UniProtKB/Swiss-Prot annotation:
Organism: Baumannia cicadellinicola subsp. Homalodisca coagulata
Any one of the GO BP annotations: tRNA threonylcarbamoyladenosine modification
The protein's name in its UniProt record: Threonylcarbamoyl-AMP synthase
Compartments (UniProt record): Cytoplasm
GO cellular component: cytoplasm
EC assignment: 2.7.7.87
Keyword tags: ATP-binding, Cytoplasm, Nucleotide-binding, Nucleotidyltransferase, Transferase, tRNA processing
Coiled-coil region: none
Catalytic activity as recorded in UniProt: L-threonine + hydrogencarbonate + ATP = L-threonylcarbamoyladenylate + diphosphate + H2O
InterPro entries associated with the record: DHBP_synth_RibB-like_a/b_dom, Sua5-like_dom, TC-AMP_synthase, TC-AMP_synthase_SUA5
UniProt entry tagged with the keyword Hydrolase: no
Amino acid sequence: MMNFIRTLLIYEIILLKIYHIIKLLHQQQVVAYPTEAMFGLGCDPDSEKAVHTLLTLKKRDWQKGLILVAANYEQLANYIDDNSLNINQRARMFSLWPGPITWTIPARTTTPCWLTGKFSTLAVRISAFKPVRMLCLAFGKPIVSTSANVSGQSPARNICEVRQQFGAAFPVMDQIIEGRYSPSEIRDAISGQLIRRG
């Protein structure tokens, strides 16, 4: 019984943290949150203002494009061209999802360039990490996912490292990362080709 109560309290604390972060996302702010391997910077992918702020904070070239992380495939429907994938390509993707694999999929023509950068594809991932899934489910859509670091510096693996790079008042979802040490692997969904080793 005590373990059950402890589990409920932990989930309640996580939910309170998530709803605080969601409030900031709705205000077009950039936040830091835990992922499988490191802390990520995230924002509302539909807000050009928020994405511009994120890119400025990271000192990242917009042409490189960004990754969206989602709780499920349905959340990606407004951003990717699912019709461009055949049954085998979909099966290959879903055999590795949810998990730390990012796939580049042809983007919809309506997907903004601040997400795709110079590419006609969009990098997307369905996370298996419970805090990320809960965050995306509560937000009702994917969030931008990029490592929490200024370009050229090491990715932040804890709250102190996030705040060293982005300031003591930077909003962070206080949660322990899963323990992986490498970023997500990136593959092309059409060809299966490895783009970045994880």
